């Protein structure tokens, strides 16, 4: 199992399906058996104690993502009074549902009617995509339907991240739905923010990043 510190409040685990089986669990346990999934979670947190200074006390947000060869588990300390105030909020997404759920969540959070009434014309929806390697970035740059996206490419802690911006005066829900669907074919949605990447990451290509990647590679 791999453990990565994302920031002060977030830890990312990666556990292969082989490692999962060696620990006495299977994929169905994670998706359909809450008791088993919580048992696996606390096993991972016990191992974390020896790797990182991260206290699991208090409310937590937990997100599990299914990859081809294993699982990514993000654990974030929740702010009291926020979504995690009940103390244990687990989000599990199967491989077939993951992309659709992410798109729906992104649109619901940023384009619900109540929120739009208070937004100005210059408001922008931000989406951060994480890549395993640069070849995936090159492949994405050649995809059709993304030619006009506002994108900036960063490197941070050995990985590549694409900051995609959707100005609300230029994109409607359908446009964003289509674009995000394509983006998620080449990478994973990241928990990092554009602010964090701008502060700690290294800019590889400024806007428009995908066009520049396609031009040079």
Curated annotation (Swiss-Prot):
Superkingdom in the source lineage: Bacteria
Disulfide bridges in this chain: none
Pfam families in the cross-refs: MecA
Function according to Swiss-Prot or TrEMBL: Enables the recognition and targeting of unfolded and aggregated proteins to the ClpC protease or to other proteins involved in proteolysis.
Complex and partners: Homodimer.
Family: Belongs to the MecA family.
Notes on the domains: The N-terminal domain probably binds unfolded/aggregated proteins; the C-terminal domain interacts with ClpC.
Protein name: Adapter protein MecA
Organism whose genome encodes this protein: Listeria welshimeri serovar 6b (strain ATCC 35897 / DSM 20650 / CCUG 15529 / CIP 8149 / NCTC 11857 / SLCC 5334 / V8)
Gene behind the chain: mecA
């Amino acid at each position: 199992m791999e453990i990565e510190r994302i920031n002060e409040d977030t830890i990312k685990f990666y556990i292969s399906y082989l490692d999962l089986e060696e620990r006495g669990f299977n994929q169905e346990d994670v998706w359909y058996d809450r008791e088993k999934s919580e048992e696996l979670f606390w096993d991972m947190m016990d191992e974390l104690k020896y790797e990182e200074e991260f206290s699991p006390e208090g409310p937590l947000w937990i997100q599990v993502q299914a990859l081809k060869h294993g699982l990514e588990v993000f654990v974030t300390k929740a702010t009291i009074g926020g979504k995690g105030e009940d103390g244990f909020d687990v989000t599990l997404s199967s491989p077939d549902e993951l992309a659709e759920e992410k798109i729906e969540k992104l649109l619901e959070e940023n384009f619900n009617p109540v929120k739009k009434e208070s937004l100005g014309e210059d408001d922008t929806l931000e989406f951060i995509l994480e890549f395993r390697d640069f070849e995936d970035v090159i492949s994405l740059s050649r995809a059709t339907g993304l030619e006009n996206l506002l994108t900036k490419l960063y490197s941070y802690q050995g990985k590549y991240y694409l900051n995609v911006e959707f100005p609300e005066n230029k994109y409607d829900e359908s446009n964003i739905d289509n674009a995000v669907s394509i983006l998620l074919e080449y990478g994973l949605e990241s928990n990092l923010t554009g602010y964090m990447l701008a502060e700690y990451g290294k800019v590889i290509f400024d806007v428009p990043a995908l066009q520049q990647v396609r031009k040079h590679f």
